[in-house]
């Protein structure tokens, strides 16, 4: 029965729509606060548990004594090879290199402590006699002061970190005159060719020596040829980081998308590019094998 006033009892009144929304908002806010407090509590407990785990430990329990790192004598300068390095070019001979296509002795030009690309039919790329897996590589290169051409036809070459075939097969760190020379960014000096541009452009003027210091982690493969772990490269150019542990997506290709092809160990290759510009030079090439 009614109250005689014609109004519903206060206890039976419905909340206005705004009131319902407000209550919902209030409940959600409280719920989020509870969640936040819960997460904070969990992390605090984890930190407390870790602290408890370390309670009573002695400093000696986290000391590692073996195996003892090998003693390596550094070079007299940062550019000089350390005592455990394999010198690939000592400024005197090409004893460590062969023609990448034929396996015959390399025919590039050696003089005044410098190795210069020799262009011409049947000469082509050169690669190391030795094969490598993971390593640290030092190489210096120079674009001629009188360089001509533009874009990719201006001092083009490359350091192939793993040569997987006789021509331009493999994984290339680009060499090019990129001092005021416009080209696609994943094709300029310091780029993993057609895969990743350099982080910065630290190129010096033509006629000045440039330096690459490279750490190469080779890809590994399963028995069926499928990829087990990808290749990684870290590279410094003239002391500046240009590739930061970049994960390659396959071999570097001029045309098409990169892909992996199974190999175990591979030579390091230097490219004799077919452009008509003046040939570039290299010096002071050494490598340290890594685990």
Regions found by a protein language model. Give the residues of each.
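N-terminal amphipathic/basic-hydrophobic helices that include classical n-h-c signal peptides
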Residues: 1-27, 231
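Bacterial N-terminal signal peptides
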Residues: 37-47
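Intrinsic low-complexity/disordered segments
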Residues: 13, 27, 32, 49-50, ...
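Serine/threonine-rich, low-complexity intrinsically disordered segments
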Residues: 7, 12-13, 31, 36, ...
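Residue-level detector of alpha-helix boundary/anchor positions
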Residues: 3-4, 41, 81
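Carbohydrate-interacting regions of secretory-pathway proteins
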Residues: 49-291
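Bacterial N-terminal signal peptides that target proteins for export
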Residues: 23-39
